[in-house]
């Protein structure tokens, strides 16, 4: 797909992320795999002011094009693509319920079968590290080895998928799961969860289920 079209999709995803209540201000960032690297949102520009020319290309060596500053979180986007060869899009946000669970430093357990949308029986919480650091990117790479989404302790959420539409869909699903988890935690702790055997059944069914979008 041509660069300008991908850039437009990135901007549309950012705007939709805000519309869904998953993000606010200039927080969060979005990228797509492109050539030997990625296209990513810039730093410090509100989503509603973004144009295609603001979107930044970073090559596979981490070098960005001159005259543009990428999101400070570009390292963990790169780490996500390296950890997940099947991923072509990454969405990061500070969704309220996901961030609240991350502050508790808890993984989201199998409270609902939709947990399997992220690839397993839980959604992990990667350890805290300062934003934009190599240390944080290493935590993200490890957390995403066997999952399509992870919480970031005291920070937010990152979700990756085969395209932007599915990455945003997954991010929204995880936020709903986080809200359900916090609601249930207010009643009982530990919370009731589905068995590993049931999640294995759901994972198998999910091979032919989910958001259907033409690639």
From Swiss-Prot:
Q: Which Pfam families match?
A: Aldolase_II (PF00596)
Q: Could you tell me the Gene Ontology terms of the biological process aspect for this record? A: D-arabinose catabolic process; L-fucose catabolic process; pentose catabolic process
Catalytic class of the enzyme = lyase
Q: What are the binding positions for Zn(2+) in this chain?
A: 73, 92, 94, 155
- Which EC numbers characterise this protein's activity in its record? 4.1.2.17
Among CDD domains, the record links this protein to: Aldolase_II (cd00398)
Q: Quote the cellular component terms of the Gene Ontology held in the record.
A: cytosol
The cofactor note from the UniProt entry for this protein is: Binds 1 zinc ion per subunit.
**In this UniProt entry, which residues are annotated as the site Plays a key role in the stabilization of the transition state and positioning the aldehyde component?**
113, 131, 209
Q: Which reaction does it catalyse?
A: L-fuculose 1-phosphate = (S)-lactaldehyde + dihydroxyacetone phosphate
InterPro entries xref list? Aldolase_class_II_sugar_metab, Aldolase_II/adducin_N, Aldolase_II/adducin_N_sf, FucA
Active site per UniProt: 73 (proton donor/acceptor)
Q: What induces it?
A: By L-fucose.
Q: Which UniProt keywords apply?
A: Arabinose catabolism, Carbohydrate metabolism, Fucose metabolism, Lyase, Metal-binding, Zinc
Q: In which pathway does it act?
A: Carbohydrate degradation; L-fucose degradation; L-lactaldehyde and glycerone phosphate from L-fucose: step 3/3
Phenotype when changing residue 131 to A: Has a slight preference for the D-aldehyde and shows an inversion of the diastereoselectivity. Loss of aldolase activity
Ways its activity is controlled: Inhibited by phosphoglycolohydroxamate (PGH).
Q: Which cofactor names does the annotation list?
A: Zn(2+)
Binding of substrate occurs at: 28-29, 43-44, 71-72
Q: Does the keyword Ion transport apply?
A: no
According to its UniProt entry, the function of this protein is described as: Involved in the degradation of L-fucose and D-arabinose. Catalyzes the reversible cleavage of L-fuculose 1-phosphate (Fuc1P) to yield dihydroxyacetone phosphate (DHAP) and L-lactaldehyde. Also able to catalyze the reversible cleavage of D-ribulose 1-phosphate, but FucA has a higher affinity for L-fuculose 1-phosphate and L-lactaldehyde than for D-ribulose 1-phosphate and glycolaldehyde, respectively.
Further details from the record:
During catalysis the binding of dihydroxyacetone phosphate (DHAP) frees Glu-73 residue from its interaction with zinc ion. Then Glu-73 residue abstracts a proton from the C3 atom of dihydroxyacetone phosphate (DHAP) (or from the O4 atom of L-fuculose 1-phosphate (Fuc1P) in the backward reaction), and moves to transfer its proton to the aldehyde oxygen atom (or to the C3 atom of dihydroxyacetone phosphate (DHAP)).
Q: How does it assemble?
A: Homotetramer.
- Protein name in UniProt: L-fuculose phosphate aldolase
What species was this sequence derived from? Escherichia coli (strain K12)
